[in-house]
Amino acid sequence: GSEMCIRDSCTIDPNVGVVTVPDERLKLLGDFYHSKKVTPAVIEFVDIAGLVKGASKGEGLGNQFLANIREVDAIVHVVRCFEDPNVIHVDGSIDPIRDIETINLELVFSDLEILERRIAKVTKTARMDKEAAKELDFLQKIKAHLEDGKLAITMELETEDEEAWMGTYNLLTWKPVIYAANVAEDELADDGASNPHVLSLIHISEPTR
């Protein structure tokens, strides 16, 4: 079993689990082609402890946790939507929108540090290299976007070069996000439809791109 802790930023390593993706077509194809072995697709989950305000500056184990997810393809943000006086919340109340904004801000701060390092490196060659100069302009555009409180994933990329560059930066705010509402067991039957916290979560979860 995995180690559990109800406190944010507990001193534990991430839990990593690999789950196979069910697909009925695999058996049919395996039988049709008389395959000796059928290997299903898998998804690797990296479960980190909760982040808190200041995580990007090292509060709790924030920097370590952020580093653990920088290489992932997508982020699943589990958001607390249940009331229980016996389960503490680091901010003292249940507010999923506030929690999401807190995490997003920490991801933005972390990405800005990545961009600053890249900008410093590219600046050294930008005067003599046209491609480097173009990338520098793009980096400044991303930086301004993030400093405006927006996620990188909401940016409109204009060229193939921009798409290629963005793919190399591993920005946390460029990754697709799934918000998973953590509800009480008695709310599972109606998918939390009567829970105002879930409804507010649905409201802000419009696709970004």
Task: Map each language-model feature to its residues.
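Short, conserved catalytic or interaction motifs in soluble domains
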Residues: 14, 21, 81
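Switch II of P-loop NTPase G domains
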Residues: 26-74, 82-97, 101, 159-168
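C-terminal-of-GTPase-core extension/linker across diverse P-loop GTPases
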Residues: 121-201, 205, 209
